[in-house]
Amino acid sequence: MDKVTDNSPDVESTESTEGSFPTVGVDTGDTITATLATGTENVGGGGGAFGGASESSAAIHATAKWSTAQLKKHQAEQAARAAAAEAALAKAKSQRDALTQRLKDIVNDALRANAARSPSVTDLAHANNMAMQAEAERLRLAKAEQKAREEAEAAEKALREAERQRDEIARQQAETAHLLAMAEAAEAEKNRQDSLDEEHRAVEVAEKKLAEAKAELAKAESDVQSKQAIVSRVAGELENAQKSVDVKVTGFPGWRDVQKKLERQLQDKKNEYSSVTNALNSAVSIRDAKKTEVQNAEIKLKEAKDALEKSQVKDSVDTMVGFYQYITEQYGEKYSRIAQDLAEKAKGSKFNSVDEALAAFEKYKNVLDKKFSKVDRDDIFNALESITYDEWAKHLEKISRALKVTGYLSFGYDVWDGTLKGLKTGDWKPLFVTLEKSAVDFGVAKIVALMFSFIVGAPLGFWGIAIITGIVSSYIGDDELNKLNELLGI
């Protein structure tokens, strides 16, 4: 019997190593190899051997500091990797299918070879020889089947890895797109702040010039008063000198010399009076000029304050428009409309008590938890943990200013801490107690500002924004919660 050789393709699969980017299913002719392309570090998420359970907070923060140009370049690189991953996936699937079919063919051959048949007379005569040949054939087919099975299993593993890689790249692309949007928003915010800072500086300069003008006016006014006192004194002395000259005393030796001396003194006083009067007039002119400068400085200050107020109003409008646009882009127009409704209704003074709000929220959340998995909840918690309190407070300041809410810092940290604890432990009451205190002091608009700041501060996902808007809605009324339920299909 001719020797049958097995020419089936070998399948190799190299394990992914930390800090490497796996590219599976690369066809090298006779083998399928799962190779590693280095260069993508700290890529997390999705579990498995690739990169750990999730991307670290430090990595997210580092990427978040990139410029828009860096993020766009990163996007292009990710797109190229995504295309390569799709090609690798298709190749891996094709190889898997081919090797699976080969395994089926070998198994069928083995079954046919092992099928019982009636021995002929010749077969019986050569039973020993036939038994040896049959055993050799059985061993060959068993070996071929084992090899084909291993190849098929390796191909299946390569296919699963290619699919996982494709999904991971898609997740990274979504994350990069979000970071790019946030970076572009940050750049726009910096430009806006620079413009606003110029207007703040204009007010400060105008205030400084007004203060300087007032100081100069006060100095000029003091100088006028001082010179008025001098003029008054010299005028009295002049009057006395005039009286001395007018009263002529004669009949004693040297009276003419005395008279001439008095007349010289009178002339000196007249000259002095003329001089101090001129000085007073000059001081009055300077004072009047300083008054004009103060008036002009007051006008400039008013203009600067008007310009600042106009920018702040525009800034407030732009902030909320940008906020609603962000929600629309990230979560859809219906969510944006709900957010606008909440902001509008927050202008009223009526709101539910902490017990009413908490009961409504818990009922809403229990239904919500059935729709979203623990993985979704962990993702939102990790997203919030990746944002520092100081970063969140910046968003809170903008939204509070846009909604004309003050005093937020006194509650800010308690709300931040209460939200994280609620997500982590499921105990939301401390947060609701803090929010009620805030609403009592500043109105329900404060709750809206506090909670909306979470939406723009972190990539929450649908479960996260549903929780945040649910908290706000529970204070305002059942109508808003019903809208959320309808939107989420729960």
From Swiss-Prot:
Stored SUPFAM superfamilies: Colicin
Compartments, record wording: Host membrane
Gene Ontology biological process terms in this record: defense response to Gram-negative bacterium; killing of cells of another organism
Name by which UniProt lists this protein: Colicin-10
PROSITE patterns xref list: CHANNEL_COLICIN (PS00276)
Biased composition (Polar residues): 1-20
Principal place of residence: host cell
Function of the molecule: This colicin is a channel-forming colicin. This class of transmembrane toxins depolarize the cytoplasmic membrane, leading to dissipation of cellular energy.
Segments crossing the lipid bilayer: 447-467
UniProt keywords, alphabetically: Antibiotic, Antimicrobial, Bacteriocin, Host membrane, Membrane, Plasmid, Transmembrane, Transmembrane helix
GO cellular component terms attached to this protein's record: host cell membrane; membrane
Biased segments, Basic and acidic residues type: 146-170
Family in the record: Belongs to the channel forming colicin family.
A molecular function (GO) term: pore-forming activity
Top-level taxon: Bacteria
Region called Disordered, residue ranges: 1-29, 146-171
A family per Pfam: Colicin
InterPro entries registered for this protein in UniProt: Channel_colicin_C, Channel_colicin_C_sf
